[in-house]
Amino acid sequence: MAGGMKVAVLPAVGAGPWSWGAGGCGAVRLLLVLFGCFVCGSAGIDLNVVTLRESEILFMNTSRQSCYKNVLIPKWHDIWTRIQIRVNSSKLVRVTQVENEDKLKELEQFSIWNFFSSFLKEKLNDTYINVGLYSTKTCLKVEILEEDTKYSVIVTRRFDPKLFLIFLLGLTLFFCGDLLSRSQIFYYSTGMSVGIVASLLIIIFIVSKFMPKKSPIYIILVGGWSFSLYLIQLVFKNLQEIWRCYWQYLLSYVLAVGFMSFAVCYKYGPLENERSINLLTWTLQLLGLCFMYSSIQIPHIALAIVVIALCTKNLDYPIHWLYITYRKMCKATEKTVPPRLLTEEEYRLQGEVETRKALEQLREYCNSPDCSAWKTVSRIQSPKRFADFVEGSFHLTPNEVSVHEQEYGLGSIIAQDELSEETSSEEEDSDSRYPLVVQQNSFLT
């Protein structure tokens, strides 16, 4: 070129397979710097962890780390006992729960996950952290977001009535599931409750029915389901505050959605198909078992109670069959005892009692509208005597009573014994007694 300028040709940057170019070298240097900061930071972290004790309140005004160590071994009476760590602050704080001090150190280190999770964590001024009875150690980090924030931390171990109520609910669902699945009251109340709680989920489900298959709108619907569940959880957490500030809107929502849910349930009606009822029964029983297991804080006791409930519910028929088999075996092995015969006095008393009872039943029937009086009168020989009997008179005449006493009473028995002792050779005596017997028989007829 003019002026004698010389141009030097340099090799192309990044021509080799291991070359990164100018931008690549900058990215590598940035990663190396971040890694060095990460290593140096992790090496120099020194935590000042506060030890938490039960029923002891700690007041703090700076971001601190604290740990609770559980040294008590759970007993059988701790099945409904809950350990909670409560963080109550004057302003919003961010609380993070981890397992031990090493996890606390990891929280202090820089990482992409910690950076994004810090934005996703809820910021509350009243936080409850549940600690398992078998958990040896639980640590937490409290981060204040504003200056002049004061907060307190307390650990409590107490009987939780909510766990007991959940256990009773599970017990009721398991043992009364077959009755509840056929109850109209349970059907309408459950339908209204589901409609009130999950109305947004129901709307999304109905909208999904009208969407074409393989449509991108399903991605939005899946996000809508997740967002709806998040809203339901958020509402339940702040239900008391919502009721205090917006009770008019909440009451209007409950009444409107409850009425619409009742209308839908009334339109379709309770379940009538036996298979559908069985499916609902099994669902309620399974839900009851889950409630019973989750409400008991000691796992092996919870499992034992679930097994006992299953055996009690489903083994009543085998136990009844075993009992019947045992009774049959006992009857087969024992000696047969002949029935005791009644004495003459017992036989006479039993006959009188049963006769009196049958006569009273006959009077009641004759006085009832079911008895056809004219047809009955046409079939008897003495209507007046029958009418007197129905009105309460005795059913026998004095002559019939005397004949019965002579025939079946004590005197007739003695007379029959005397007659049997006489010899058959006395023909004249037997002939003289024969007309008397004929006369008595003719009188009875």
Curated annotation (Swiss-Prot):
<keyword id="KW-0812">Transmembrane</keyword>
<comment type="subunit">
    <text>Homooligomer. Interacts with RAN-GTP. Interacts with EMD.</text>
</comment>
<feature type="transmembrane region" description="Helical">
    <location>
        <begin position="289"/>
        <end position="309"/>
    </location>
</feature>
<dbReference type="GO" id="GO:0005637">
    <property type="term" value="C:nuclear inner membrane"/>
</dbReference>
<feature type="modified residue" description="Phosphoserine">
    <location>
        <position position="425"/>
    </location>
</feature>
<keyword id="KW-0539">Nucleus</keyword>
<keyword id="KW-0472">Membrane</keyword>
<feature type="region of interest" description="A; required for its colocalization with lamins at the nuclear envelope">
    <location>
        <begin position="186"/>
        <end position="297"/>
    </location>
</feature>
<feature type="modified residue" description="Phosphoserine">
    <location>
        <position position="368"/>
    </location>
</feature>
<keyword id="KW-0325">Glycoprotein</keyword>
<dbReference type="GO" id="GO:0005635">
    <property type="term" value="C:nuclear envelope"/>
</dbReference>
<feature type="transmembrane region" description="Helical">
    <location>
        <begin position="216"/>
        <end position="236"/>
    </location>
</feature>
<dbReference type="GO" id="GO:0071763">
    <property type="term" value="P:nuclear membrane organization"/>
</dbReference>
<feature type="transmembrane region" description="Helical">
    <location>
        <begin position="161"/>
        <end position="181"/>
    </location>
</feature>
<keyword id="KW-1133">Transmembrane helix</keyword>
<feature type="region of interest" description="B; required for interaction with RAN-GTP">
    <location>
        <begin position="336"/>
        <end position="405"/>
    </location>
</feature>
<feature type="transmembrane region" description="Helical">
    <location>
        <begin position="245"/>
        <end position="265"/>
    </location>
</feature>
<dbReference type="GO" id="GO:0043249">
    <property type="term" value="P:erythrocyte maturation"/>
</dbReference>
<feature type="compositionally biased region" description="Acidic residues">
    <location>
        <begin position="418"/>
        <end position="430"/>
    </location>
</feature>
<protein>
    <recommendedName>
        <fullName>Nuclear envelope integral membrane protein 1</fullName>
    </recommendedName>
</protein>
<dbReference type="Pfam" id="PF10225">
    <property type="entry name" value="NEMP"/>
</dbReference>
<comment type="similarity">
    <text>Belongs to the NEMP family.</text>
</comment>
<comment type="function">
    <text>Together with EMD, contributes to nuclear envelope stiffness in germ cells. Required for female fertility. Essential for normal erythropoiesis. Required for efficient nuclear envelope opening and enucleation during the late stages of erythroblast maturation.</text>
</comment>
<feature type="region of interest" description="Disordered">
    <location>
        <begin position="418"/>
        <end position="445"/>
    </location>
</feature>
<feature type="modified residue" description="Phosphoserine">
    <location>
        <position position="424"/>
    </location>
</feature>
<keyword id="KW-0597">Phosphoprotein</keyword>
<feature type="region of interest" description="Required for nuclear localization">
    <location>
        <begin position="336"/>
        <end position="445"/>
    </location>
</feature>
<keyword id="KW-0732">Signal</keyword>
<feature type="glycosylation site" description="N-linked (GlcNAc...) asparagine">
    <location>
        <position position="125"/>
    </location>
</feature>
<dbReference type="GO" id="GO:0043131">
    <property type="term" value="P:erythrocyte enucleation"/>
</dbReference>
<dbReference type="InterPro" id="IPR019358">
    <property type="entry name" value="NEMP_fam"/>
</dbReference>
<keyword id="KW-0265">Erythrocyte maturation</keyword>
<feature type="transmembrane region" description="Helical">
    <location>
        <begin position="186"/>
        <end position="206"/>
    </location>
</feature>
<feature type="signal peptide">
    <location>
        <begin position="1"/>
        <end position="44"/>
    </location>
</feature>
